Amino acid sequence: MKLLLGGILLAAGFAALPLVTQRNDLLNLGVQIFLAVALAQSWNLLGGYAGQITLGHAAFFGLGALVTRMLWVGGAPLYLALAAGALVATAFGVLIGLPAFRLRGAYFSIGTLALAEILRITVGNLMPEISTIPAAALASYNILPRYYLTLLLAVLCVAVVALLVGSRVGLGIRAVREDEAAAEASGVGALKHKLLALMVSTALVGFTGGAFAYYHVSYYPQHAFSPAWTFDALLIAFIGGVGTIHGPVLGALFYVIFKEVLAVQWVDLHLLIFGVLFILVVLFFPGGLVEAWSRARRLITRRTV
């Protein structure tokens, strides 16, 4: 209940921010945080709750961005373009999920990374290097609708994952993560639950890619397929607390703000610093900021008793 109340207050605070300030730098920072929440939460469903450590998340992000951008620039209503992008990402997810789920462990991760790279190279060879929005749309560009769209998307991703994980289906997904053979023996269809987690995950990240394409004035199709998006999702989820609802939210806040600070102070070293931070988190705080906060609370409680 406390987490729900905290989430509502946080979302309300972000929703009220444009009423307090019109500074574009703060609103753009908010958009980056919301996109990071959605990106990490969509990966968290498949990688954290279903236990399928995919390294191909960027493929679905890129497909959502590409389809949405093409349709929206072509004159389609934004909501239809976003829905089409998510639908294409989901369809591609099912297409590669059926053969990919035959692989286990590291082989699954490497296989999804290889498929994502094949798609990235293909798009780079077939699509133009850059896409800019039409002059009429550029003249009327406004950060506010992008801000509220990405905020709504972040809230939607958190809510969908929370509802799914808390349902009977979510119990089956987690059972498959813990022991696939035991889950099968108990009557839980492992492939069915993994495919369902994949479909929801790819739909959410497809919407996220579409929102990214709508947000940017200049859009590089191949950039949206970069493996950096996958590793950002992993890093945010693990820093915050993988396999938890609020972990990706905490991770996104920390990651985006800290990244902005590092990009100014140590522009050439921020990637190295995050790499070292990721290793330290995995080694000493595998539960991320969520675990660190729990440890701190227990320590404070012991000292006050």
Segments from the language model and where they lie:
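Transmembrane alpha-helices and adjacent helix-loop boundaries
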Residues: 1-305
